[in-house]
Structures are given as C-alpha cells and as structure tokens.
Swiss-Prot record:
Residues 205-398 form the Tyr recombinase domain. This is Integrase. SUPFAM superfamilies: DNA breaking-rejoining enzymes. Keywords: DNA integration, DNA recombination, DNA-binding, Hydrolase, Transferase, Viral genome integration, Virus entry into host cell. Gene3D superfamilies: 1.10.150.130, Integrase, DNA-binding domain, Intergrase catalytic core. The active site is at residues 244, 273, 347, 350, 374, 384.
Length: 439
C-alpha cells in the first residue's frame, strides 16, 4: 500500500470551496475540512479509549491554526491515546481552567476572528452590534448553559423596539456563533436553531415614487436643474436604467460594452480602500445585464468626456479614487423641490419603471423582474428565467422606457392608451405607430 501523502502549506492555503463540504487528509487522523462557504477547520478522527467508538477532535480554524500547529495538536492527542486518555476530555478540562473561556463573549470573539474573508467595514459592524445589543445581556454567561430563551431575550428586546432588520441580523449572528461552538466542541448541540420564527416578520420597505401622471412635471424639473454635470447625468442614468444606488455609484468603465450597448454589473467588485461598501456588485450575487437605450448611451458618451480616464464613472469631487456620495441623487431631488421621504427618492425610480412597464401590458413579468434583478422564489421558474435571460425582450423594453419618458416631456401620455391600442399590434409595429401618432 502506498504511504498517504501529507498536506503542505500551499495546498491548505489554495484549497477552494466545492458544492459540498469535503476533507483533505494529512495522516494520523488529522484532516482539513473545507466547507461549501470556504471556511477551513482542522479536525482529528480517533477512537475513544473508553468504548472504542469513533469521535472527532476540533483543533481550530485555519489560518488561526496553521498546518504545523494542527500537527502538533494531533501528536499531543496521540500521546494521550497511547496512555488510554481521551484527548477530548482533556481538551474540555483545559478550556474550563482558562478563566472566561466558555463565556458567550469569548466564543463570539473567537468566531468573529475566524471570519478572515470579511471586509474591515463588515467586521467592525458585526462586532459593534454584538457589543451593543448582545454582550451586555449574555456575554458573561457560560455558553454551555445557554438555552434558546436566553439567546432570544436580548434579540426580542431589539425587535420590540421596532428595529426589526437589526433583530433579524442579530439572530443570524447568534445562530452562527452557536454553530461555531458546536463545530469546535464547546457545546454538543445548537439551541439557536430553535429561534426560527420567533421574531416579527419584516415588512418590505416601500420607497416613495411618483405616479406616471407626474412624469411631465418631474422631467421639466430635471431639465431645469442646474447642478453639476456629473450629478445631472447620475440622476438621468439612474432613471433610465433603474438600477440600485450602489450598482450605479460603484460602476467601473470596464463593465460597459459600447459596441453592444450593454452594461454587465458583476456579482462582486474589487473593494476600494477606505470606501464603505465599494465591494458591492449585484444584490442577488450574480452578474446582471443592463441593455442600454440610445438615450443612456448618449449620457455615457458625455460622461466619458469627464471621467473616461478614471476607473470609476462617478469619481469623488476631491479624490478620483473615491466615489460620489450615496446622497448625491437624493440631494439633487431635494434641490428640485421634492421630499425624498414622501414624494420620490432615487430608489423610487425602480418603482416608477416597474409600474409603467407592468401597466403598459407590453412586457412579460419575467422580463420585467429579470431587469429589476429581483430574486425568484420559485426554483423551477428561477432556473428558466436565469437560463433564458429574456435579453431580446429586455432590449426592446429598456428602449421603450427611455422613449416613453421622452414622450412625457411635454404632456402626459396615459398608459391606458397603450393598453387599449396594443391588442391590435405586436410590440415593434405598435410602438413605432404609436410614437408617430403622438408627435
């Protein structure tokens, strides 16, 4: 039999996640467990001296525990086994002797430190929430004694205060911490698993948006707005493409195909040092294609004259390596005389587009939802939508939206007219004739 090949540091470092958790053996029972999410855990398989049943030892998370350190822990465990001593019992006793080692806060901070892939901003925010809402209540508690009700108490307090989103995130964090405790043999089972359904159902946030009957008024105010050229272009592109704020603010020039009039927004972007959330790509974590209308291409060509020599479409005022403020579009809307809390905000452009596209009766729901990059809850339908993309229909649809806005510059064009006319004509011929009839 060929001797088992041992791991080397390079293999450990470059091990990539797969669809399912898998193991990489090092010998002597030691192996690296690589989760589907990319986390790497050192474990050792052995048989308990008392009953000869197979068990597992947890040695920690890579890279906090290196390959050499994991081997040293394995060797120590083997010495104990030779003496008929269960290394897991010794491991637990050693942890108990370490003052505070079993407190919820100690384990939570260990879990926090193990998440090496997080951005600094995200790491700080996660820890700040735990320090603010969780540690004051259960931080000093022995994690082995915590029950579901203990874990829920501080989270329910946050939920009752109306901070439902914060409470949901805290529930996720506490569940992950307790899962980490199970995986590292601090506890045998996860009481946080039973917290599901205990919090208020979070209602979808609705952003203020203008009805289509007010499009002429809005477009007139936009035409009269005399802010910075880059700001005006940002507002117009936001309206024409109805993408999310971060998707536009962090856009790079290399995402645009000018020959095909397409914008490919990546699932994730390279982070800009010192810029919060600059790593954000698509909310749904997959590439999104935005067909660009003629009007959008004109704006992009204008913008290229201003920032085309930079990486970003919308660099900061004083530092080209930074990006324009997240409040830029809403500030412009306020300067135009709108209340961004009750009348219209930048995110409300998505609602305005969704309403007009749907009311027109010209476009399939699949094409509209795909263009809005909404998640599809039905898995079978989602697979179909993802495969087909509906790109040809979406090209027509995005041009229709831009043309419809243009047509509303001087007077309101009712969507009821479109609904009453479309049944006689197909999309292409109908739209051409309709545009000619209202000139």
């Amino acid at each position: 039999m060929c001797p088992q090949m041992k791991l080397n540091a390079r293999q450990v470092e470059t091990a990539k996640p797969k669809d399912k958790t898998y193991k990489m053996a090092d010998g002597g029972g030691l192996y690296l467990e690589v989760s589907a999410k990319g986390s790497k855990y050192w474990r050792m398989k052995y048989r308990r001296p008392s009953d000869k049943k197979e068990d597992r030892l947890a040695f920690g998370v890579w890279p906090t525990v290196t390959l050499a350190q994991a081997r040293a822990k394995r060797d120590e465990a083997k010495k104990l086994l030779v003496q008929g001593i269960d290394p897991k019992v010794v491991q637990k006793e050693a942890r108990a002797e370490n003052s505070g080692a079993y407190t919820f806060e100690a384990i939570a901070r260990e879990w926090h430190a193990s998440n090496k892939r997080w951005s600094e901003d995200h790491r700080s925010r996660v820890l700040r929430y735990l320090e603010l809402y969780i540690f004051p209540h259960i931080g000093s508690s022995d994690i082995r004694q915590l029950k579901t009700s203990h874990l829920l108490a501080p989270i329910k307090k946050v939920d009752a205060s109306g901070k439902h989103d914060v409470a949901q995130r805290l529930q996720q964090r506490v569940t992950a911490i307790m899962r980490y405790a199970v995986q590292n043999d601090y506890i045998d089972s996860n009481p946080a698993s039973d917290m599901a359904g205990a919090l208020s159902t979070t209602k979808a946030r609705h952003y203020p948006a203008l009805p289509s009957s007010r499009f002429p008024e809005f477009l007139a105010r936009l035409a009269a707005y005399r802010g910075r050229v880059m700001t005006r272009i940002a507002v117009k592109l936001s309206l024409l493409t109805f993408v999310r704020s971060s998707e536009l603010r962090f856009a790079r020039w290399d995402e645009f195909d000018f020959d095909k009039s397409l914008w490919r927004i990546p699932a994730k972007r390279e982070e800009i040092k010192g810029v919060r959330y600059s790593y954000r790509g698509m909310k749904m974590k997959e590439e999104h294609i935005v067909p660009l209308s003629r009007q959008a291409m004109i704006l992009l060509n204008q913008l290229k004259q201003i920032s085309g020599d930079k990486e970003l479409l919308f660099p900061g005022d004083h530092d080209a390596t930074k990006v324009m403020s997240e409040n830029t579009v809403n500030s412009a809307l306020r300067a135009m005389g709108y209340d961004t809390k009750t009348e219209v905000c930048g995110h409300g452009f998505r609602t305005m587009a969704r309403g007009a596209l749907g009311e027109s009766g010209l476009w399939s729901d699949d094409a509209i939802e795909r263009q809005l990059s909404h998640s599809e809850r039905n898995n079978v339908r989602a697979a179909y939508i993802h495969t087909s993309e509906h790109l040809d229909e979406r090209r027509l649809m995005m041009q229709w939206w831009a043309d419809y806005l243009d047509m509303n510059r001087n007077k309101y064009i009712s969507l009821m007219i479109i609904q009453n006319t479309k049944k006689y004509l197909n999309k292409n011929s109908y739209w051409l004739i309709f545009k000619m009839s209202v000139k």
